[in-house]
Amino acid sequence: MKLRQLEIALQRCAGFERPRASREQYQTPATLAARLLYDAFVSGDIAEKTVMDLGCGTGILAIGAALLGAREVRGTDIDPEALRTAEKNAALLGADVTFIAADVGSTEKIDPCDTVVMNPPFGAQKQNIHADRPFIDCALAIAPVTYGIFNAGSTAFVEAYIAGRGNITGRVAGTFSLKRSFTFHTRDLQEIPVEILRIVRA
């Protein structure tokens, strides 16, 4: 499957029915999800691999990994409603994905894998400052390779945070197209600069 084909397929995924601002529940744009997944695919980190989507939300990254030929794909999220939507999305696209209700703060229900893909919270809400740290910690604990979406300019922070535990071996700039989802949003569409980081466990 080519990049454009993947993007078109992922555009069919439904978003959150009732998104919660406190959890920064924003649907990962299909263009950005496809870019992350295709970079991972070209690097040999998807096909025939066991892939985990941490904080999978409605499942777009997990589903894309399955469409690119991952041997086994699992997605985990704390929100049961989001997981129900993820299951519907997977069925719609014929993707074989196992979705699990679990908190990334505890790895008891999260088995080791070859590759983690994730779009962790950016910590934009006051109550969510550093909300991406548990995701990074969990990813390093369960997989040798991680691909994550972070706010532009986060590379230095991530490098310092994972020092001695992992290294950033790839970085791709991108844009997160954020549609108006909550009353505090002042624009119908906001383009947020982001970066996709490839992290390899030390």
Kindly give the residue locations of the regions a language model identified.
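Class I S-adenosyl-L-methionine-dependent methyltransferase catalytic core
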Residues: 1-202
